């Protein structure tokens, strides 16, 4: 059984994205990129390092995945807004107490980036939808 280690690398701004990504690629078989504005603004730079290195990225949201990742669990921000609005209405009308109200979620859709999957020779799992565009 192969031993796995976790390594956390973070980028504070766009000036260090390439060096942080290179360090992650050198150390990792796969990377996870959370939902992050710096990553979202630098997907091309990230892809230009990870793809040639053969390191797939699992991403925290569809926009980042469409630029540099292989897969994500995508949510609809519109649907999330509707759910949040309904929760707010319950609070404002007195139907719910914010301190005891359960958290509500929207469904996530498994999606993959067909271009990067093909470049890396990765076959997406059944049930994953291709990211369009």
Regions found by a protein language model. Give the residues of each.
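Short, small-residue-biased leader/transition segments that mark boundaries at the very start
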Residues: 3-8
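Structural motif
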Residues: 12-24
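Solvent-exposed loop/turn segments at secondary-structure junctions
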Residues: 14-16, 36-40, 63-66
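Glycine-rich, charge-decorated loop segments at or immediately adjacent to ligand/cofactor-binding or catalytic sites
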Residues: 19, 65-74
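Periplasmic-binding protein-like
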Residues: 28-40, 57-60
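Venus flytrap/periplasmic-binding-protein-like
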Residues: 42, 46-69
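Hydrophobic alpha-helical segments within soluble ligand-binding/sensing domains
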Residues: 75-96
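Hinge/cleft segment of the Venus flytrap/periplasmic-binding protein
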Residues: 90-133
């Amino acid at each position: 059984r192969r031993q796995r280690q976790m390594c956390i690398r973070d980028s504070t701004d766009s000036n260090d994205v390439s060096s942080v990504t290179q360090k992650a690629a050198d150390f990792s078989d796969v990377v996870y990129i959370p939902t992050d504005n710096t990553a979202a603004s630098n997907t091309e730079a990230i892809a230009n390092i990870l793809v040639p290195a053969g390191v797939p990225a699992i991403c925290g949201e569809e926009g980042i995945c469409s630029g540099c990742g292989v897969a994500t669990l995508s949510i609809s921000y519109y649907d999330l807004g509707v759910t949040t609005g309904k929760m707010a209405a319950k609070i404002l009308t007195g139907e719910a107490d914010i301190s005891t109200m359960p958290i509500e979620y929207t469904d996530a859709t498994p999606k993959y980036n067909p271009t990067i999957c093909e470049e890396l020779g990765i076959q997406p799992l059944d049930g994953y939808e291709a990211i369009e565009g």
